[in-house]
């Protein structure tokens, strides 16, 4: 899929990786709906992007992705405004081991909800023109992390769900591809959460171990993750792919023994 002329919806778009995604999509000619719960950050993000791009290229919608009604209304607003939806990036996420129910709701349940809403609008069975859904996971979705078990569980869930949904989308001839990005540590505000007891709870005493891991593995710039996003969108052969991005190896893919139904599925026109 060529990004130019397409309409994208990015959750968690006001800062960090989400903002980098929005910038990359705009640079490649897309129109972008910036979805975020943080009103102040969202308004600032749109204002900054308006200085680089035509204001009509972006739309900011305040939304708590954990609220099902707000999320449904947001998708409707975006499609009503731009007339279509081609690219969905479920990026919003938190790190909170203390309020673990919230972590699962935002990191996993909202991704599942967003994916199904995206399919409702993009699937050819529903009159859509196909498209692509990118769900944000993490390297923590591919390995155990003693200091963040709930965050780890949420990111594992994203991978299992997305790979399965990608197979289903192919079987249904929906015209929609689904892929996952699993970055390592990224220089975003979420890294600050490891310093806070209100986020880490009983695991706060292990924050120095996480810092040591960051030093060992390195910290990525959000623009590197955005490059991976564009690659996943533009390569029509990728469906159910798990893209890993690390400081040492850059962009590469997780290998699985998978069904032929999942590989090289030409789902979009």
From Swiss-Prot:
InterPro entries: NAD(P)-bd_dom_sf, Sc_DH/Rdtase_CS, SDR_fam
Subunit structure: Homodimer.
PROSITE patterns noted in UniProt: ADH_SHORT (PS00061)
Residues of the active site: 151
Sequence similarity: Belongs to the short-chain dehydrogenases/reductases (SDR) family.
Broad class of the protein's primary localization: cytoplasm
Positions contributing to substrate binding: 138, 148
Protein's cellular compartments: Cytoplasm
Physiological role: Catalyzes the NAD-dependent dehydrogenation (oxidation) of a broad array of hydroxylated polyunsaturated fatty acids (mainly eicosanoids and docosanoids, including prostaglandins, lipoxins and resolvins), yielding their corresponding keto (oxo) metabolites. Decreases the levels of the pro-proliferative prostaglandins such as prostaglandin E2 (whose activity is increased in cancer because of an increase in the expression of cyclooxygenase 2) and generates oxo-fatty acid products that can profoundly influence cell function by abrogating pro-inflammatory cytokine expression.
Catalytic activity: prostaglandin E2 + NAD(+) = 15-oxoprostaglandin E2 + NADH + H(+); (15S)-hydroxy-(5Z,8Z,11Z,13E)-eicosatetraenoate + NAD(+) = 15-oxo-(5Z,8Z,11Z,13E)-eicosatetraenoate + NADH + H(+); (11R)-hydroxy-(5Z,8Z,12E,14Z)-eicosatetraenoate + NAD(+) = 11-oxo-(5Z,8Z,12E,14Z)-eicosatetraenoate + NADH + H(+); lipoxin A4 + NAD(+) = 15-oxo-(5S,6R)-dihydroxy-(7E,9E,11Z,13E)-eicosatetraenoate + NADH + H(+)
UniProt EC number: 1.1.1.141, 1.1.1.-, 1.1.1.232
Protein's organism: Mus musculus
Recorded name of the encoding gene: Hpgd
Cellular component, GO annotation: basolateral plasma membrane; cytosol; extracellular space; nucleoplasm
Positions bound to NAD(+): 12-20, 36-37, 63-65, 91, 151-155, 186-188
Protein name: 15-hydroxyprostaglandin dehydrogenase [NAD(+)]
Gene3D superfamilies found in the cross-reference section: NAD(P)-binding Rossmann-like Domain (3.40.50.720)
Keywords assigned: Cytoplasm, Fatty acid metabolism, Lipid metabolism, NAD, Oxidoreductase, Prostaglandin metabolism, Tumor suppressor
Expression sites (tissue/organ): Expressed in proximal convoluted tubules of the kidney, where it colocalizes with the prostaglandin transporter SLC22A22 (at protein level). Expressed in lung, intestine, stomach and liver.
Membrane spanning stretches: none
Molecular functions (GO terms): 15-hydroxyprostaglandin dehydrogenase (NAD+) activity; identical protein binding; NAD binding; NAD+ binding; prostaglandin E receptor activity
Example GO BP: response to ethanol
């Amino acid at each position: 899929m060529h990004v130019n002329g397409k309409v994208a919806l990015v959750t968690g778009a006001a800062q960090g990786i989400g903002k980098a995604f929005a910038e990359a999509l705009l640079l490649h000619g897309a129109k972008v709906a910036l979805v975020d719960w943080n009103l102040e950050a969202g308004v600032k993000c749109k204002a900054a992007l308006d200085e680089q791009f035509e204001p009509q290229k972006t739309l900011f919608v305040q939304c708590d992705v954990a609220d099902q009604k707000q999320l449904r209304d947001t998708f409707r607003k975006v499609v009503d405004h731009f007339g279509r939806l081609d690219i969905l990036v479920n990026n919003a996420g938190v790190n909170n081991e203390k309020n673990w129910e919230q972590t699962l709701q935002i990191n996993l349940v909202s991704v599942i909800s967003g994916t199904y809403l995206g399919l409702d609008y993009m699937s050819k069975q529903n009159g859509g023109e196909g498209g692509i859904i990118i769900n944000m996971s993490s390297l923590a979705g591919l390995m155990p992390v003693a200091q963040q078990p709930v965050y780890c569980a949420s990111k594992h869930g994203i991978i299992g769900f997305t790979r399965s949904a990608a197979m289903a989308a192919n079987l249904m001839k929906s015209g929609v591809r689904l892929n996952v990005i699993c970055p390592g540590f990224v220089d975003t505000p979420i890294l600050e959460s490891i310093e806070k007891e209100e986020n880490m709870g009983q695991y706060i005493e292990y924050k120095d171990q996480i810092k040591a891991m960051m030093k060992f593995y390195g910290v990525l710039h959000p623009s590197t993750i955005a490059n991976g996003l564009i690659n996943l969108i533009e390569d029509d052969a990728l469906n159910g792919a798990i893209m890993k991005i690390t400081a040492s190896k850059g962009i590469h893919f997780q290998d699985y023994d998978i069904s032929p139904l999942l590989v090289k599925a030409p789902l979009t026109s």
